[in-house]
Amino acid sequence: MQAMVCAFFFRYEKKMKYIEKIEHAFSEEGWLSQKIKGFRPRSAQLKMAQAVGNAVRFANPVVVEAGTGTGKTFAYLVPALLSGKKTIISTGSKNLQDQLFNRDLPTIQKALKYKGKVALLKGRANYLCLERLDQVIAMGVLGDKSVLADLSKVRKWHQSTQTGDLSECVTIAEDSPILPQLVSTTENCLGADCPNYKECHVVQARRKAMEADVVVVNHHLFCADMAVKETGFGELIPEAELVIFDEAHQLPDIASQYFGQSLSSRQLFDLCKDINVVYRTELKDLAQLGKAADLLQKSVQDFRLFMGGEGQIRGNLRELFVDKKVVDGLNKISEHIDFLSQIIKKSLGRSETLDKIFERLAEVKVLLKKMIETHVVGYCYWYEANGRSFGLHITPLTVADKFGEQLKNQKIAWVFTSATLEVGGKFDHFCQRLGIQEAEQMVLQSPFDYAKQSLLCVPRFLPDSNKAHTLTALGELLMPVIEANQGRCFLLCTSYYMMRGLADFLREHSQLNVLLQGETSKSKLLEKFIQEPHSVLVATQSFWEGIDVRGDDLSLVIIDKLPFSSPDDPLLKARMEDCRLQGGDPFNDIQIPDAVITLKQGVGRLIRDVTDRGVVMICDSRLVMRHYGATFLKSLPPSTRTRDLEKVVAFLKEN
């Protein structure tokens, strides 16, 4: 009995020591203060670290909204490393993943004198495929001379890289057309049959991850791993005792993608290309093979024409399949896949690549059949198209059951954190979408003095959003404010129409440097914005979050209207209908929470540091005229508020 009591107190003391270590790390005399220049203890940061520590101790989930400036990265890294547990850290973007692995994690490792192994793991599309490189060198590249120049740069970089991570090849643009030709996909990877298997960068990265104590991944890879494990056919990332999701607000939508199924024109074109490569290099006697691949490619191109529409379009597959031409076009693709399968079947065993292609054709055939059967309950059947490309998708309306099952079955610590999780003071929307139950919930306010540092303005006399002159009227309203601030402005739009229209208006009526999303890569736009004074960046979607511009370079953020998703979006319509059938209120239960999270992200672009000052303008009178406006305002930082543009200009001139 005495031995049992002693053992109990020994375990209790050991657990207490763990929390004490966390508290010491963040104290004024602690490890972080000693080792990290400029580190200052923050009460909110310590509270979060303690919550993560308790999640580790009791194997419970914790959900934390940590306002900008809280220091949430250190707040979860310290307890993770001190725990000694096998840890997976997942981020919403590859940019944050790289920053975490290359900057934040080494800082904490050094401060804590951490001796464990750490690893970075991305999806296979981020790594140079040696087999594809050999094929491109043998067959030639697709594209103009600039693509050839980029290939030369990749080949030179390949001689020195240790990881094969293409983001490290800084001599080529991140959107270079050579990159898709040099990476493998799940469909075309030869696996252990590949002649380059031993040197494969993906295999080596996964091996390091399996051996590491801390692995940094992203949500896409984590969800892909969940989907693979559900099938029982292996795993992409190792099991862990602690899983941390940063930028967790993105998780529900990303998880939906991976628990669904998709078929894209790119997949089909890649298939045709791979068939032609085999025909030209290994099986030159199979002339019929090349011709059949060309026929499949032509049928894919024809199908895109039958879909109709210009620019970026999204819609419901059920409605699309009402058109007989579209259904016939899909059947024609299926026929050509059957024809190719018959040809290849006679030559199985002659080429490992061809054998793999035969399997891929069978998988596409099954997927095509599923796409046509659009009646399965609980899923949204939808499509998207842009230019010559298209994608057909089957997406579950909710992942709460699948994700919630993971939480129940794995008795480990789960940490979900972001600057934007709660809506109107509650986490219900986020937790329900992921099936999170009985989690500790915590909101940590930003240490910034928003009342002094920032102004929130909903201007008076805003143009009616339903009238034809809205764009011009809004441009005229905003121009004096943007000019008074000499640019240094993000103009975040909720549609491509408004984005292009406002950019054109500013270019016509202003001497400021106007940068437009889509005219060059995201990183180059940000670089230009910072380097070229008096710039206005007009953007949508991808610039609402994950952008960190500090200091005087950015002191004005303008949002054209509340970011409600388009009511025509097929996924949203399906979620709303499902909500309605279950007795819910789609507007209050889905549309408002989604829009609040997005708005919080957009507003969060402004104040990134204690010395930042500036103005957020939201050009939507519904914030003050509709009852639901209070929900939005309650979720935003406590900035000083005004409707007077003269006060806005005066505040900016003080900056």
Language-model features: where?
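A contiguous, basic/glycine-rich beta-loop/short-helix subdomain that forms a polymer-engagement track
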Residues: 180-215, 226-233, 339-462, 469-476, ...
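Signature of the SF2 helicase/ATPase Hel1-core->accessory helical subdomain module
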Residues: 82, 98, 103-106, 186-188, ...
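Conserved helicase motor "Helicase C" RecA-like lobe of SF1/SF2 P-loop NTPases
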Residues: 494-518
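Conserved RecA-like ASCE P-loop NTPase motor core of nucleic-acid helicases/translocases
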Residues: 87-95, 415-417, 487-494, 617-619
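A substrate-engagement module of RecA-like helicase motors
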Residues: 15-35, 85-213, 220, 275-276, ...
